Each structure stands twice: as structure tokens, then as C-alpha cells.
Amino acid sequence: MSKKKKLCDSRKGDMAEYYAVTWLWDNGYEVFKNCGCTGIADLIALKDGQTTLIDVKTAQPQLHKKTGNNFTKCCSRTKEQIEAGVQLLQFNAVDRSLYFTKHRDKKYD
């Protein structure tokens, strides 16, 4: 039995974005990728006349020290992303699931 090769962080990010594209397609979105490696959003998604700017983030598995429960940790949006209405789409690399982050407020994360 061969060992799986460990992926570098940039390759994990590439995988997350491609899983995000297919997940969004499955959920009725038309998807357009950011052609550069920088910018406030990775994807632009259209559905039912609504445009959504999306930044895909790979969630990091964590173990809660007090409870022992597993949870995923992700980062916050930047001020520029908040002002532009960018939504974070989290990718769980363990089970390859995706979900939109429920942002606390439009002005603050």
C-alpha cells in the first residue's frame, strides 16, 4: 500500500477552489474564476439574478481544548471584502464538504 503524498498549501487552495466551482454548479450557480492569484474574491457566482463575490478558504480542523469536540477554524474577511460584500465559502479538506460562512454583521466579522 502506498502512502499519499502530502500536498503543499497552494495545491490545497487550488483543490478547494475547484471543489467550490463544482459545488456551486450543483447548487444552480454560474461560476467565473478570478484569473489572477490576488484580489478580494476567488470566484464570481450568479444565481437567480444575484451576483455573489466568493473567497474560498480551506477550513482547518481543530480540537476544542475544554470540550474535546472537533470543529473547523477559518479566517475572517478583510475590511475591503466586507465593504464589497464578499462571502466566505469554507472547504473542509477532510470530508470535502463546503458551506458558506454565516457572517455576524455586514460591517464586522
At which residue positions do the language-model features occur?
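Active-site metal-binding core of divalent-cation-utilizing nuclease and nuclease-like domains
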Residues: 26, 30-40, 44-48
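Acidic-basic catalytic patches of nuclease active cores, encompassing PD-(D/E)XK
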Residues: 1-34
